[in-house]
Amino acid sequence: MTTSHILSAVDPTTGLSGNVSGGGGGGGAGGGAGSGSPQHVTHNGHGHGHGLGGVAAVSGGGASVSGNGGHRVVGGAGSPNELDRNLRISLDDRELWLRFQNLTNEMIVTKNGRRMFPVVKISASGLDPAAMYTVLLEFVQIDSHRWKYVNGEWVPGGKAEVPPSNPIYVHPESPNFGAHWMKEPISFAKVKLTNKTNGNGQIMLNSLHKYEPRVHLVRVGSEQRHVVTYPFPETQFIAVTAYQNEEVTSLKIKYNPFAKAFLDAKERPDTLYPHDTHYGWLIPPPTHYTAAAAAVAAPPPLSIAQSHGLVASCPSVSSAESVGPSSGGSCDRYGRSLSSRSVAPTRTTPYSRPRVVSGSGSNGSAGNASSTSPQPPSAPQTPTSLHSTSTGSVSTSVSSSSGGGIGSAPSTGCFSSSYAQSGFMSVDASPTASVFSYPSSWQSNGNYWNATSVPGPMPMNVCSGRNISSHNSPSPTNGSPSYTTSSPSYTIHHLTPHSHQYNMAQTDIYGTGVGVGGGAGTTGSPQAAYGAAAHQVYHPTPTSPTHQLYTNAVLNAPSALSYSASGWHNGSGAEYGLYQNAAAAYYQPEYIPLEIGYATHPLEPVDVSKTLDDPQAAMYKPSDEQGSVITLECASSSLKSSHDIKIESSSLEHAGERGTVGGGAAVVSVPTAVVNGAPAVAADTWTPLTPPQSTLQ
């Protein structure tokens, strides 16, 4: 094998007839005898010869062959080979190439050209930094036959075609100094393999033939051309128009960064999705953050443009304006900057519990938009209301607090209210409603609907006693874009001391004089959005008997707001302080039936056993003289006087207490409202409460 085609690729104008000494091996009849060791070829205008089994014979000028580093250096005394004895060329990603070699690697060739994977990438050392070198990549056809894929393996399949004339790729950075080639690995990522002679600088290969890439390092810039060839047998491949071996396909999909779309969802690495890195862990706050923040006065707040970007490095970019426990750019143990809303790029695990943000700042200060005090590690490392500007909406709390002296001393050191429950919303939520950073553009601040919010740059103390803000959204559905307080999209644990989940005025729900927080936070509530409290709403459930009696209260907030109320707080929300008045403690989350005994038949009398010691208990007190036992029979779809109503009176031995009279008979002594919404009747007047069938939805 001669190197005339190599040198012609380097310098096409040089005449090379009869004065090239070649290093044989690896191609033609040599059969790869010289593979594994580079051959150095000198073009000095005097010697001529031919390759013999990988050993180059140079005539004239005292050939000296010396082994060095596992490759042959061939040349006359005083030749430039003496300068390149320390030359080393190594293949990068050799382990990956070996994995493909074990499977018989395949490379796709197309009409328009297809890039290789793995990419031939080499590292050079020992070059003369001041000398000029050209790097070439040659694809040598190493077999004299074709290949075919039969029964899961490659077997010889016929005579080989004539190899292309010039499958040599010149590195686009050639020629260049040795210092340039040694600076970083030399990559042939732009090589394109084709099966057509389109002449676009692409490498033409014959399909179903095996090739071996070889790197040629040519020293240029002098009269004598010096070629060093490095074959890499582990890079051999068969050119194909479509992958034959499925294992090769899987391996390429696994390691090729441009083929990640073919991966299954469970196999895709988290780093493919940058928005996942915006979510951090919710970690319980240590006490030293609260102590350190109480003694630090916050500097003037930054503008949105200064504090908008995500800071992923540590120390942070804004360390000059930050105040930390120890230094300006201090970091906690998880690599996050304490003085900015930074996001560690490696924290890609989605958080295992719901995230609820109270207030505008992620560190719990309701009016401090810059939040330059050290934020506890339990702060959700997410772009909160400040970073929601990138999604198309600017929250009101940021725009109002970035104008003036919001970052004052009273707004620091108040982490206990926001992070007492590891990042969940506390009971005393700030009047500035929460803004959740969903990756969309429809969120808005609750201040738009909140009548109790503080407008303008008015300082607010987070630690002061604050009212619970009521939800004043004009739309009672949870699909409303303005419904931003305690979003029901997250399943909030029923033990968390967050404010009333539905933020509805309690006077509207229960008809009592007790409101949320004494009624101070219920201003501006849309009274017309919910049913009046003086009427009865009858809505039977499939699991309840059809003769149950319902008291004079509307459906409570879960049903009125069209939630699936059976799963919220497991029907025992009153035990955890969800409902603010005493009468609500006995109401169930879905419908409000009386607690009746288990009747064996719907028409048997039932016993009402409910006593309360509040102002509403008067309606449950029994008549001291007599009790009324009624039997309700409904045969038609409307309440008429023709119904058979049997009224029995019996004197009770225990007139002042509740108890079963006997045989399942019970005393019914609860005044109830008529189904159609009429006012409640007197305590000694009874009306059958089985509703008309036409009202059953």
From Swiss-Prot:
Residues 316-330, 352-373, 381-401, 469-488 have a biased composition (Low complexity). One of its GO terms (cellular component) is nucleus. Residues 337-351 have a biased composition (Polar residues). Pfam families: T-box (PF00907). The keyword Transcription applies. InterPro entries: p53-like_TF_DNA-bd_sf, T-box_DNA-bd, T-box_sf, TF_Brachyury, TF_T-box, TF_T-box_CS. Residues 1-60, 316-407, 462-488 are annotated as: Disordered. Residues 20-35, 50-60 have a biased composition (Gly residues). GO terms for molecular function: DNA binding; DNA-binding transcription factor activity, RNA polymerase II-specific; protein homodimerization activity; RNA polymerase II cis-regulatory region sequence-specific DNA binding. Residues 96-264 bind DNA. It comes from the Eukaryota. It is found in: Nucleus. Keywords: Developmental protein, DNA-binding, Nucleus, Transcription, Transcription regulation. Required for the specification of the hindgut and anal pads. This is T-related protein. It comes from Drosophila melanogaster (Fruit fly).
